[in-house]
Amino acid sequence: MKKANAWSLALFPFIGLWLGAAPAWGAAAPALSEVRVFKVESARCTESIPDRVTTTQMCTHRGPTQVSVMEVGLGNNSVGRFNGAVLNARRTAVCQVGNISQACNGAGQLMGYIYVFDLNVEGPGGFEYSNSSINPPRNTLKTQLNIL
C-alpha cells in the first residue's frame, strides 16, 4: 500500500474550508413552477399585471419600457422576446428567508429570479418569456403579454 505524503494530507484542511463556504450541494434545486409578467413600466404609467391577464390595460406604453418577469423555481434557458426579437435582461436572484421572499444577500434558500427586460415600444406588440426547468420534469413554461 502506498503511503500518503505530507503535501496531499495538507490539502484536507483547505478543501474542508472551501466546502464549508459552498452552498449545500445535496439540496435539490426547486423545479420551475411559474413564470409570469408582473409589471410593465414606461414614461406614461407603471402597470401591475394581475395573474392570468394577457393585455396591458392602464395606458398605451410607448418609448423606453421595462417588463418585469417573476420566475419561481430554477431554469436554464430563459428567453425574452418582443415582436419576435430576442431581448437582454437584468436578473436578480430571489431567496426565501423564513416567510419572506427577498433579493438574495447570502441568507435563505434560492427560490427563483426576477428578470427585467428593456425594450423600445413603438406600437402595440407581443412580449413572450419562456424558460425550461433545470430538473425533472424539465418542463418549459411560457408567459405572453400584449403590450398596447
Residue ranges, per PLM feature:
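Bacterial N-terminal signal peptides
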Residues: 10-20
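Short, compositionally biased P/S/T/A/G/V-rich stretches that sit at domain boundaries
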Residues: 24-62
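Short, exposed beta-strand-loop hairpins at the edges of beta-sheets
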Residues: 117-147
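Extended low-complexity, serine/threonine- and proline-enriched intrinsically disordered segments
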Residues: 71-97
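Aromatic sugar-binding surface patches on proteins
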Residues: 99-117
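Aromatic/hydrophobic beta-strand junction motif of beta-rich domains
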Residues: 61-75
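Cysteine-centric segments in proteins
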Residues: 81-85, 103-104, 114, 126-132
